[in-house]
Amino acid sequence: MGNQQVVSITGAGSGIGLELVRSFKSAGYYVSALVRNEEQEALLCKEFKDALEIVVGDVRDHATNEKLIKQTIDRFGHLDCFIANAGIWDYMLSIEEPWEKISSSFDEIFDINVKSYFSGISAALPELKKTNGSVVMTASVSSHAVGGGGSCYIASKHAVLGMVKALAYELAPEVRVNAVSPGGTVTSLCGSASAGFDKMHMKDMPGIDDMIKGLTPLGFAAKPEDVVAPYLLLASRKQGKFITGTVISIDGGMALGRK
Protein backbone atom coordinates (compact mmCIF):
# COMPACT_ATOMS: atom_id res chain seq x y z
CA MET A 1 0.00 0.00 0.00
CA GLY A 2 3.03 2.27 -0.24
CA ASN A 3 3.25 5.39 1.90
CA GLN A 4 -0.47 6.06 2.19
CA GLN A 5 -1.50 6.64 5.81
CA VAL A 6 -3.66 4.06 7.60
CA VAL A 7 -6.06 4.81 10.46
CA SER A 8 -8.12 2.41 12.57
CA ILE A 9 -11.28 3.74 14.24
CA THR A 10 -13.51 2.20 16.91
CA GLY A 11 -17.11 3.24 17.39
CA ALA A 12 -17.12 3.88 13.65
CA GLY A 13 -20.72 3.01 12.85
CA SER A 14 -22.49 6.19 13.92
CA GLY A 15 -22.12 9.74 15.19
CA ILE A 16 -18.63 11.18 15.44
CA GLY A 17 -17.07 7.83 14.52
CA LEU A 18 -18.93 7.65 11.22
CA GLU A 19 -17.95 11.22 10.43
CA LEU A 20 -14.32 10.35 11.24
CA VAL A 21 -14.46 7.56 8.67
CA ARG A 22 -15.76 10.01 6.07
CA SER A 23 -13.21 12.69 6.92
CA PHE A 24 -10.18 10.42 6.95
CA LYS A 25 -11.25 8.79 3.68
CA SER A 26 -11.64 12.25 2.13
CA ALA A 27 -8.15 13.12 3.39
CA GLY A 28 -6.69 10.13 1.54
CA TYR A 29 -6.27 7.64 4.37
CA TYR A 30 -6.90 3.93 4.25
CA VAL A 31 -9.43 3.20 6.99
CA SER A 32 -10.35 0.21 9.11
CA ALA A 33 -13.48 0.42 11.24
CA LEU A 34 -14.87 -1.42 14.25
CA VAL A 35 -18.68 -1.33 14.43
CA ARG A 36 -21.02 -3.01 16.88
CA ASN A 37 -23.56 -4.68 14.60
CA GLU A 38 -24.36 -5.80 11.07
CA GLU A 39 -26.69 -2.85 10.52
CA GLN A 40 -23.79 -0.44 10.95
CA GLU A 41 -21.61 -2.63 8.74
CA ALA A 42 -24.24 -2.50 5.99
CA LEU A 43 -24.41 1.29 6.26
CA LEU A 44 -20.64 1.59 5.78
CA CYS A 45 -20.62 -0.91 2.93
CA LYS A 46 -23.40 0.99 1.16
CA GLU A 47 -21.52 4.28 1.41
CA PHE A 48 -17.95 3.10 0.88
CA LYS A 49 -18.40 -0.17 -1.04
CA ASP A 50 -15.31 -2.30 -0.34
CA ALA A 51 -12.95 0.62 0.40
CA LEU A 52 -12.92 -0.03 4.16
CA GLU A 53 -11.74 -2.93 6.28
CA ILE A 54 -14.68 -3.51 8.64
CA VAL A 55 -14.87 -5.63 11.78
CA VAL A 56 -18.15 -6.25 13.61
CA GLY A 57 -17.87 -6.91 17.32
CA ASP A 58 -17.87 -5.76 20.92
CA VAL A 59 -15.17 -3.18 21.62
CA ARG A 60 -14.95 -4.54 25.18
CA ASP A 61 -13.63 -7.85 23.85
CA HIS A 62 -9.84 -7.77 23.53
CA ALA A 63 -9.91 -10.48 20.85
CA THR A 64 -12.12 -8.18 18.76
CA ASN A 65 -9.60 -5.35 19.05
CA GLU A 66 -6.80 -7.74 18.11
CA LYS A 67 -8.85 -8.88 15.11
CA LEU A 68 -9.30 -5.26 14.01
CA ILE A 69 -5.57 -4.64 14.05
CA LYS A 70 -4.70 -7.96 12.39
CA GLN A 71 -7.13 -7.38 9.54
CA THR A 72 -5.86 -3.83 9.16
CA ILE A 73 -2.28 -5.05 8.77
CA ASP A 74 -3.28 -7.96 6.54
CA ARG A 75 -5.01 -5.59 4.13
CA PHE A 76 -3.07 -2.32 4.34
CA GLY A 77 0.36 -3.46 5.57
CA HIS A 78 0.86 -1.00 8.42
CA LEU A 79 -0.91 1.27 10.91
CA ASP A 80 -0.25 4.97 11.44
CA CYS A 81 -3.01 6.04 13.83
CA PHE A 82 -5.44 4.33 16.21
CA ILE A 83 -8.55 6.29 17.20
CA ALA A 84 -10.29 5.06 20.35
CA ASN A 85 -13.74 6.53 19.89
CA ALA A 86 -16.40 4.08 21.12
CA GLY A 87 -18.54 5.36 23.95
CA ILE A 88 -21.88 5.37 25.73
CA TRP A 89 -23.66 7.98 27.85
CA ASP A 90 -25.40 7.57 31.22
CA TYR A 91 -28.44 9.78 30.58
CA MET A 92 -27.75 11.75 33.76
CA LEU A 93 -27.91 8.65 35.97
CA SER A 94 -28.17 9.76 39.61
CA ILE A 95 -26.19 8.42 42.56
CA GLU A 96 -29.58 8.17 44.30
CA GLU A 97 -30.66 5.29 42.07
CA PRO A 98 -30.60 1.77 43.59
CA TRP A 99 -27.02 0.57 44.08
CA GLU A 100 -27.45 -2.45 41.80
CA LYS A 101 -28.37 -0.15 38.90
CA ILE A 102 -25.51 2.23 39.63
CA SER A 103 -22.96 -0.57 39.99
CA SER A 104 -23.88 -2.36 36.76
CA SER A 105 -24.05 0.91 34.83
CA PHE A 106 -20.69 2.03 36.22
CA ASP A 107 -19.06 -1.23 35.12
CA GLU A 108 -20.56 -1.05 31.63
CA ILE A 109 -19.71 2.63 31.13
CA PHE A 110 -16.13 2.22 32.31
CA ASP A 111 -15.68 -0.99 30.30
CA ILE A 112 -16.62 0.86 27.10
CA ASN A 113 -15.45 4.42 27.76
CA VAL A 114 -12.16 3.55 29.47
CA LYS A 115 -11.12 -0.10 29.45
CA SER A 116 -11.88 -0.58 25.75
CA TYR A 117 -9.48 2.30 25.03
CA PHE A 118 -6.73 0.49 26.93
CA SER A 119 -7.59 -2.72 25.07
CA GLY A 120 -7.52 -1.14 21.63
CA ILE A 121 -4.30 0.75 22.30
CA SER A 122 -2.68 -2.41 23.67
CA ALA A 123 -3.65 -4.30 20.52
CA ALA A 124 -2.47 -1.52 18.21
CA LEU A 125 0.74 -0.61 20.02
CA PRO A 126 3.16 -3.11 18.42
CA GLU A 127 2.18 -1.84 14.96
CA LEU A 128 2.22 1.83 16.01
CA LYS A 129 5.74 1.45 17.36
CA LYS A 130 6.88 0.14 13.98
CA THR A 131 5.64 3.31 12.26
CA ASN A 132 6.18 5.86 15.06
CA GLY A 133 2.45 6.34 14.87
CA SER A 134 -0.10 7.97 17.13
CA VAL A 135 -3.19 7.43 19.26
CA VAL A 136 -6.16 9.79 19.42
CA MET A 137 -8.87 9.24 22.02
CA THR A 138 -12.33 10.75 22.22
CA ALA A 139 -12.66 12.54 25.54
CA SER A 140 -15.54 14.98 26.16
CA VAL A 141 -16.50 18.35 27.52
CA SER A 142 -17.43 16.16 30.50
CA SER A 143 -13.70 15.52 30.94
CA HIS A 144 -13.41 19.14 32.06
CA ALA A 145 -16.77 20.25 33.46
CA VAL A 146 -19.96 18.95 35.04
CA GLY A 147 -23.42 19.16 33.53
CA GLY A 148 -22.82 17.05 30.44
CA GLY A 149 -23.85 13.79 32.03
CA GLY A 150 -24.25 11.95 35.29
CA SER A 151 -21.41 11.15 37.66
CA CYS A 152 -20.63 7.75 36.07
CA TYR A 153 -20.17 9.26 32.61
CA ILE A 154 -18.24 12.28 33.86
CA ALA A 155 -15.92 10.06 35.90
CA SER A 156 -15.24 7.88 32.86
CA LYS A 157 -14.35 10.88 30.72
CA HIS A 158 -12.10 12.34 33.41
CA ALA A 159 -10.32 8.97 33.39
CA VAL A 160 -9.54 9.47 29.70
CA LEU A 161 -7.58 12.62 30.57
CA GLY A 162 -5.36 10.66 32.93
CA MET A 163 -4.89 7.97 30.34
CA VAL A 164 -3.77 10.50 27.72
CA LYS A 165 -1.17 12.05 30.00
CA ALA A 166 0.15 8.76 31.38
CA LEU A 167 0.40 7.01 28.02
CA ALA A 168 1.86 10.05 26.25
CA TYR A 169 4.64 10.08 28.83
CA GLU A 170 5.10 6.30 28.82
CA LEU A 171 5.14 5.83 25.05
CA ALA A 172 7.24 8.84 24.02
CA PRO A 173 9.17 9.22 21.82
CA GLU A 174 7.94 6.25 19.75
CA VAL A 175 4.18 6.95 19.82
CA ARG A 176 2.27 10.21 20.27
CA VAL A 177 -0.92 10.12 22.39
CA ASN A 178 -3.58 12.84 22.35
CA ALA A 179 -7.33 13.34 22.65
CA VAL A 180 -10.21 15.48 21.44
CA SER A 181 -12.93 16.73 23.80
CA PRO A 182 -16.14 17.30 21.81
CA GLY A 183 -19.13 18.91 23.47
CA GLY A 184 -22.49 20.30 22.54
CA THR A 185 -22.75 17.79 19.72
CA VAL A 186 -26.00 16.06 18.79
CA THR A 187 -25.29 12.42 17.93
CA SER A 188 -26.95 9.01 18.19
CA LEU A 189 -24.98 8.27 21.38
CA CYS A 190 -26.82 5.57 23.30
CA GLY A 191 -26.82 4.65 26.98
CA SER A 192 -25.95 1.61 29.04
CA ALA A 193 -27.95 -1.58 28.65
CA SER A 194 -27.55 -2.10 32.40
CA ALA A 195 -29.74 0.93 33.07
CA GLY A 196 -32.13 0.20 30.20
CA PHE A 197 -30.82 3.07 28.09
CA ASP A 198 -29.32 1.08 25.21
CA LYS A 199 -32.27 1.75 22.88
CA MET A 200 -32.21 5.48 23.57
CA HIS A 201 -30.29 7.98 21.46
CA MET A 202 -29.22 11.46 22.48
CA LYS A 203 -30.41 12.99 19.21
CA ASP A 204 -33.97 11.79 19.92
CA MET A 205 -34.23 13.51 23.31
CA PRO A 206 -36.99 16.16 23.23
CA GLY A 207 -35.52 19.66 23.27
CA ILE A 208 -31.89 18.51 23.03
CA ASP A 209 -30.93 21.18 20.48
CA ASP A 210 -32.40 24.00 22.55
CA MET A 211 -30.80 22.64 25.72
CA ILE A 212 -27.36 22.63 24.09
CA LYS A 213 -27.88 26.11 22.67
CA GLY A 214 -28.59 27.34 26.18
CA LEU A 215 -25.41 25.76 27.52
CA THR A 216 -23.09 26.87 24.72
CA PRO A 217 -21.65 30.40 24.44
CA LEU A 218 -21.53 30.10 20.65
CA GLY A 219 -25.27 29.49 20.72
CA PHE A 220 -25.79 26.42 18.56
CA ALA A 221 -25.69 22.64 18.75
CA ALA A 222 -22.90 21.07 16.72
CA LYS A 223 -23.20 18.19 14.30
CA PRO A 224 -20.56 15.43 14.09
CA GLU A 225 -18.96 17.00 11.02
CA ASP A 226 -18.33 20.16 13.07
CA VAL A 227 -15.99 18.45 15.55
CA VAL A 228 -13.72 16.13 13.52
CA ALA A 229 -11.02 18.59 12.36
CA PRO A 230 -8.85 18.23 15.50
CA TYR A 231 -8.60 14.48 14.95
CA LEU A 232 -7.08 15.08 11.53
CA LEU A 233 -4.59 17.53 13.01
CA LEU A 234 -3.51 15.16 15.79
CA ALA A 235 -3.22 12.19 13.43
CA SER A 236 -1.13 14.13 10.90
CA ARG A 237 2.56 13.28 10.82
CA LYS A 238 3.32 16.76 9.51
CA GLN A 239 1.03 19.13 11.42
CA GLY A 240 0.86 17.01 14.57
CA LYS A 241 4.41 15.75 14.89
CA PHE A 242 5.26 17.91 17.95
CA ILE A 243 1.95 17.32 19.77
CA THR A 244 1.61 14.70 22.51
CA GLY A 245 -0.20 14.58 25.84
CA THR A 246 -2.60 17.21 24.53
CA VAL A 247 -6.39 17.39 24.69
CA ILE A 248 -8.11 19.71 22.21
CA SER A 249 -11.54 20.99 23.25
CA ILE A 250 -14.10 21.63 20.54
CA ASP A 251 -17.28 22.40 22.44
CA GLY A 252 -18.51 25.83 21.41
CA GLY A 253 -17.21 27.16 24.71
CA MET A 254 -19.45 24.89 26.77
CA ALA A 255 -16.73 24.17 29.34
CA LEU A 256 -16.57 27.91 30.05
CA GLY A 257 -20.09 27.93 31.45
CA ARG A 258 -23.32 29.59 30.38
CA LYS A 259 -23.09 32.99 28.72
UniProtKB/Swiss-Prot annotation:
It holds the Pfam family adh_short_C2. Gene3D superfamilies: NAD(P)-binding Rossmann-like Domain. Pathway: Aromatic compound metabolism; naphthalene degradation. InterPro entries: BphB-like_SDR, NAD(P)-bd_dom_sf, SDR_fam. Its EC number is 1.3.1.29, 1.3.1.60. Substrate binds at S140. Catalyzes the oxidation of naphthalene dihydrodiol into 1,2-dihydroxynaphthalene. This is 1,2-dihydroxy-1,2-dihydronaphthalene dehydrogenase.
